[in-house]
Amino acid sequence: MAETNNECSIKVLCRFRPLNQAEILRGDKFIPIFQGDDSVVIGGKPYVFDRVFPPNTTQEQVYHACAMQIVKDVLAGYNGTIFAYGQTSSGKTHTMEGKLHDPQLMGIIPRIARDIFNHIYSMDENLEFHIKVSYFEIYLDKIRDLLDVTKTNLSVHEDKNRVPFVKGCTERFVSGPEEILDVIDEGKSNRHVAVTNMNEHSSRSHSIFLINIKQENMETEQKLSGKLYLVDLAGSEKVSKTGAEGAVLDEAKNINKSLSALGNVISALAEGTKSYVPYRDSKMTRILQDSLGGNCRTTMFICCSPSSYNDAETKSTLMFGQRAKTIKNTASVNLELTAEQWKKKYEKEKEKTKAQKETIAKLEAELSRWRNGENVPETERLAGEEAALGAELCEETPVNDNSSIVVRIAPEERQKYEEEIRRLYKQLDDKDDEINQQSQLIEKLKQQMLDQEELLVSTRGDNEKVQQELSHLQSENDAAKDEVKEVLQALEELAVNYDQKSQEVEEKSQQNQLLVDELSQKVATMLSLESELQRLQEVSGHQRKRIAEVLNGLMKDLSEFSVIVGNGEIKLPVEISGAIEEEFTVARLYISKIKSEVKSVVKRCRQLENLQVERHRKMEVTGRELSSCQLLISQHEAKIRSLTEYMQSVELKKRHLEESYDSLSDELAKLQAQETVHEVALKDKEPDTQDADEVKKALELQMESHREAHHRQLARLRDEINEKQKTIDELKDLNQKLQLELEKLQADYEKLKSEEHEKSTKLQELTFLYERHEQSKQDLKGLEETVARELQTLHNLRKLFVQDVTTRVKKSAEMEPEDSGGIHSQKQKISFLENNLEQLTKVHKQLVRDNADLRCELPKLEKRLRATAERVKALEGALKEAKEGAMKDKRRYQQEVDRIKEAVRYKSSGKRGHSAQIAKPVRPGHYPASSPTNPYGTRSPECISYTNSLFQNYQNLYLQATPSSTSDMYFANSCTGSGATSSGGPLASYQKANMDNGNATDIKDNRSDLPCGYEAEDQAKLFPLHQETAAS
């Protein structure tokens, strides 16, 4: 019951946001000019509101200026509404929600959630509060529950006081601000949001957060109730600016349509002359009917953009706010009378009714006297007020005369009509139930149809993509086949070249073998020469000793002869000189022979070098051509290694020859020194030995030049051998790389073949689905013909029914012609019933058509049902396995349960004195959730992890369902609060906990399937098995 009516206007507040980054980069101007706290000038025109907030206003200032008083009004029993209206990206969601868990940037809704409980905690302790919250959105003109996403099309009904409400919406009982924030987080995650050119997080629906507060005074039993609607409207959009396309464009159309309906309601209420206000044009205006011109205290936020780019939209928004400011609401306290108050009111109304009956009796007596022709004196007449009252009563009860006329109908006929009326009303009730069931079925089937259409569209898109990919893969496959053909041809050519090169290699190997034999012969010759050279050296040494001895003897003889003769010239005999020349001649012959042997060896080495270079060149060509053939390369590598070893051995032999050559050179130098000494001794023989000296010098120069050339040639050969070895290593690496690439190409080819096979199978499946779709179309045609025949039959039955009713009316008129008034009213009732029957017939036709349309979807649904059944079987198997795993982990969980037991005992000292009942009542005078006595009332990570671990272990114990475990006894005993034993194990404790927390008893709490929906702020709410609850 509502009392204490107060007329008040809608409070309109205007808020401008700052320029965003895009507007600053675009160079937009800041157009509003603020004049005081209640006016703003746009384009030279002033707009006046209750309050105007500039861009630098904080969230806290906005809340204190507008929303704080509404919290007090709602707690005092009034209804309240706060909603934000404006263009898209104007800051509506920031104003209403903000950042939920940021103390500085949180919006109106989280601040109201905290402020409500702060006021409650400071109120009288005799009051008890029950707080429920709901959260839903209006998306594409359908009401969608944000706390239960399965409810996608809720309806709007009226209660006994003709106040609109959303039927079937989820209602959650809360006992603290953190629980409200959790509900907001859950609903916000399910809300529709999209990206547009003007807003990265554009709301695509109107969201309504409803807080229903009921309070009861435990002493006086007085009850008050208040509702607070917190509405975040979607922004009006100009498609040319937002760039909406596809589904976003459809959302924009519905948003603008509903906002246009809101504007029409505001305009009609602002004019005040229209008798009809189009509340039913939109579900949003229907829900907010009481907030616009009804029993509510309403605050409207007008959110505007300060950019010159949005000049037109800003002016339109400000004009909308000015019209809304003229609307008058009649707010009253929602008070429920107590039994004593109802009794007093009943006595008062009883006395008033008795007085009215007396007045009616006097008026009837006076009226009968006037009809009988008597003249009633003025003293006996009733006073003017009483006569007016009697006239008013006569006007209010015209139906009683008709009822008296109806009574004159025969009892049998009246009973017959009453039975007919009861039957018809029963049929109406049955039809209503059937219509409700059919409408629910239609909604489900329509939703399934939409799902199937979406699936079909996605399947078609996937089919097109698959076709494109298939064509692309076919082209790639053709190209790959061509490449494979080319590779095969190249391999064939390489095989032919391989055979040719193999033959060439065999020939070269034979040639190399011949060269090796020749080289071995030359080496043997060189060894014999070395031995001969050593023998000659020995002979030469022996001769030199002999010559030295002879010369020494001669010198002694000459010295003695010179002493005897004096300074006479002494000449050696010719035989001695001839012997020396003969010795030198023999030495020169040996030296020339050695030179000729060395030249032949050098010449042969050059030939070998040329042959080696030619062979390496041919092997490099062979390596490039036969890179993909690993066997051939390995053979070449073996041969190259053998040749390299051979060259190394040749090089060693060359070094030995070089060393022997050096030793011969040293011996020659010694001989030259001795010859020099001999020349000094034999000065008189100088003209004869001059030719020999020149020959020795020429021979020495020639030997030196040959030695240097030989050293250079050997160094060059070593460098070339090293380079060839590097080339061989590089060829090995290249061969390995090419072999890996060939293996990769083969793997890719196999992968392409498998993908082609998969695409062909998918194409066959899509072809099969298309054939099934065509068959469904043919079945649909047959069903339409069947429905047409059924409609014709229904039409014939209706005609027969009308004829029957007409004949009955005619018979009743012939039997009692004097009861024309009763028959007339009966005809009206019959026509009313006929109209109802006709409407039911239309509804039935529509239902038949809908059913015919939906029957063709039955095969698909049956297929999905079979798939679902198979999935359920698989899940049951998985569940069975999980249970077996849980039984295995029982010992490990036991230790965790013991630890939690100690933690719960430690935390039990911080619980509140009064635990939550089914409806979670909130008592003033207790400490709030963040008080020192309840340190775990905050949303800290430690508390959340603690609660999660507690619930997880309890759930595992519930799944095990073993009464013998000590953990079951712990939960049964510790949750009762008295230490008494409890039967039933963890299953009974689990069910009891759900009942006491409002999850199984309250018919409006739709979270009965979520046993974990508790806050960490009150650990006792998880398992509150109190003695008083058990007693009740």
From Swiss-Prot:
GO terms for cellular component: axon cytoplasm; microtubule; perikaryon; perinuclear region of cytoplasm. It catalyses: ATP + H2O + a kinesin associated with a microtubule at position (n) = ADP + phosphate a kinesin associated with a microtubule at position (n+1, toward the plus end). Residues 353-1032 are annotated as: Interaction with BICD2. Residues 907-1032 are annotated as: Globular. The modification Phosphothreonine is found at T397. Residues 904-939 are annotated as: Disordered. Residues 9-327 form the Kinesin motor domain. It is found in: Cytoplasm, Perinuclear region; Cytoplasm, Cytoskeleton; Perikaryon. GO terms for biological process: anterograde axonal protein transport; vesicle-mediated transport. Oligomer composed of two heavy chains and two light chains. Interacts with GRIP1. Interacts with FMR1 (via C-terminus); this interaction is increased in a mGluR-dependent manner. Interacts with BORCS5. Interacts with ZFYVE27. Interacts with VAPA, VAPB, SURF4, RAB11A (GDP-bound form), RAB11B (GDP-bound form) and RTN3 in a ZFYVE27-dependent manner. Interacts with BICD2. Interacts with DTNB. Belongs to the TRAFAC class myosin-kinesin ATPase superfamily. Kinesin family. Kinesin subfamily. Microtubule-dependent motor required for slow axonal transport of neurofilament proteins (NFH, NFM and NFL). Can induce formation of neurite-like membrane protrusions in non-neuronal cells in a ZFYVE27-dependent manner. The ZFYVE27-KIF5A complex contributes to the vesicular transport of VAPA, VAPB, SURF4, RAB11A, RAB11B and RTN3 proteins in neurons. Required for anterograde axonal transportation of MAPK8IP3/JIP3 which is essential for MAPK8IP3/JIP3 function in axon elongation. This is Kinesin heavy chain isoform 5A. It comes from Pongo abelii (Sumatran orangutan). The gene is KIF5A.
